[in-house]
Amino acid sequence: MGDQPFIPPPQQTALTVNDHDEVTVWNAAPCPMLPRDQVYVRVEAVAINPSDTKMRGQFATPWAFLGTDYAGTVVAVGSDVTHIQVGDRVYGAQNEMCPRTPDQGAFSQYTVTRGRVWAKIPKGLSFEQAAALPAGISTAGLAMKLLGLPLPSPSADQPPTHSKPVYVLVYGGSTATATVTMQMLRLSGYIPIATCSPHNFDLAKSRGAEEVFDYRAPNLAQTIRTYTKNNLRYALDCITNVESTTFCFAAIGRAGGHYVSLNPFPEHAATRKMVTTDWTLGPTIFGEGSTWPAPYGRPGSEEERQFGEDLWRIAGQLVEDGRLVHHPLRVVQGGFDHIKQGMELVRKGELSGEKLVVRLEGP
């Protein structure tokens, strides 16, 4: 299938960070070139992640585009693409604020897909629903990889079974990453147990948690040790502060185990030598590494690129089959000013158990 006769406009609207480190709507932003192995997308909906709100200072490339999660309509395909056609709907992730590709970010009118970190939107799934998935899929997959746990098999009728229950503690079980991860853990045969606020217990259980605990309950680490018969080996920390790290280390069983967080964790709270530690870095899913400041800088990796491709092949099938579902949504209709306003809501932590999605209506 050759290139389609779509000519990008000379300028587009995008959300960026200017020379003064201010988030701004740029109405004269450039449009990206179309690589031979990718597709050109008119962005219809975007989701806002906490990471989007942190792209300032040393993390910002002035005038590069913001945004990770997008869903949209294919308007052109590269000459090497054979499985997608104009008019198809796709969703995926971008490596925002990447200095090598400053004109590729989700918060823009047009974007091009990146690597194989994207998939077709199944029938019955809206743009808004699809836009809520990419960062969660990518981070959940990276977390499972770092914990040493296998990804689900999309062809298996039933999850694999273990001779004994294998529990995985998910601290912050009502976050968007947690709800995707718990579903994937279930599909891989593991048993998630979660902590969150009581008003989100039903959400965590609906996304795979076997049991949910109030994170403020007294002596909770001991309660979880008792619940898991002191055999908990895996903990995923979706909050990552001194309290969450300390708690996870206390809940892991006497034989030790593995702790993974979504951000660099406070090392002074990692108090047990029998517990291995790591943390996820979103851009590694593309295999491109990261140019962010220490400790986030990372070289590119072919192994990580291949993992990202495998993950998205699996996750895309699970979404298509209805076995992997999105986080509850708070949808806003509007333009790029609404994305900017939504970023402030997310930055201030004003959402609980919801993913903020903006359905684009225009600049």
Swiss-Prot record:
Changing S138M: Reduces catalytic efficiency. Changing M274A: Impairs the binding to lovB. The lineage of its organism: Eukaryota, Fungi, Dikarya, Ascomycota, Pezizomycotina. Disruption phenotype: Loss of lovastatin biosynthesis. Trans-enoyl reductase; part of the gene cluster that mediates the biosynthesis of lovastatin (also known as mevinolin, mevacor or monacolin K), a hypolipidemic inhibitor of (3S)-hydroxymethylglutaryl-coenzyme A (HMG-CoA) reductase (HMGR). The first step in the biosynthesis of lovastatin is the production of dihydromonacolin L acid (DML) by the lovastatin nonaketide synthase lovB and the trans-acting enoyl reductase lovC (called the lovB-lovC megasynthase complex) via condensation of one acetyl-CoA unit and 8 malonyl-CoA units. This is Lovastatin nonaketide synthase, enoyl reductase component lovC. The keyword Cell wall biogenesis/degradation does not apply. Keywords: NADP, Nucleotide-binding, Oxidoreductase, Transferase. One of its GO terms (biological process) is polyketide biosynthetic process. SMART domains: PKS_ER. Each MAT domain from the lovB homodimer binds one lovC molecule to form the final active lovB-lovC megasynthase complex. Pathway: Polyketide biosynthesis; lovastatin biosynthesis. Belongs to the zinc-containing alcohol dehydrogenase family. NADP(+) binds at residues 51-54, 174-177, 197-200, 215, 262-263, 280, 351-352. Lovastatin acts as a hypolipidemic agent that works as inhibitor of (3S)-hydroxymethylglutaryl-coenzyme A (HMG-CoA) reductase (HMGR) which reduces HMG-CoA to mevalonate and is the key step in cholesterol biosynthesis. Lovastatin, simvastatin and related compounds are widely used to treat hypercholesteremia and reduce the risk of cardiovascular disease. Furthermore, statins such as lovastatin were found to be anticancer agents. It comes from the Eukaryota. The keyword NADP applies. Changing K273G: Impairs the binding to lovB. GO terms for molecular function: enoyl-[acyl-carrier-protein] reductase (NADH) activity; lovastatin nonaketide synthase activity; NADPH binding; oxidoreductase activity; oxidoreductase activity, acting on NAD(P)H; polyketide synthase activity. It catalyses: holo-[lovastatin nonaketide synthase] + 9 malonyl-CoA + S-adenosyl-L-methionine + 11 NADPH + 19 H(+) = dihydromonacolin L-[lovastatin nonaketide synthase] + S-adenosyl-L-homocysteine + 9 CO2 + 11 NADP(+) + 9 CoA + 6 H2O. Changing K54S: Reduces catalytic efficiency. Pfam families: ADH_N. Residues 226-272 are annotated as: LovB-binding.
